[in-house]
Amino acid sequence: MAINYLNSRKRLYVVDGYAGWDPEDRVRIRVITTRAYHALFMHNMLVRPTPKELEGDFEGGADYYIFNAGEIPANKNIPGVVGREAISLNLQQRKMVILGSQYAGEMKKGVFTIMNYLMPKKGHLPLHSSCNVGANGDVALFFGLSGTGKIALIAVG
């Protein structure tokens, strides 16, 4: 449904980027959307590949795909769908589909979920946090949900 809808659009935005900075652990993400602001949101959120990385790492595709067709409602005839919104992530197929929601944060939450699934398998503890490093090398961690001021705290630190 989402792919058919996206294929019917005259203009699509495709954003390739990495989730994570470490070259050994980062995940290649490809976002396909019809909304410019969704593309800009993910362009700012993901680590931008260099032209060389884009040509090499993404030429064969990405590790995970996000198909954002938020303009169209979900089909309530599909088992498990109970409303007009459906945000589905299949970790085996490595695909996320967004239907019926214009909220750009759905994509971010999907990437968080992917990383929260993958990183413990590599021995890493994923955290939704930010930090400040003091003059003596001491570190303060700030934990919180989206929009609770973690970035604001480090900006004034």
Where is each model-derived feature located?
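Glycine-rich phosphate-binding P-loop
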Residues: 133-157
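A noncatalytic interaction/capping subdomain that flanks phosphate/NTP-handling catalytic cores
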Residues: 1-139
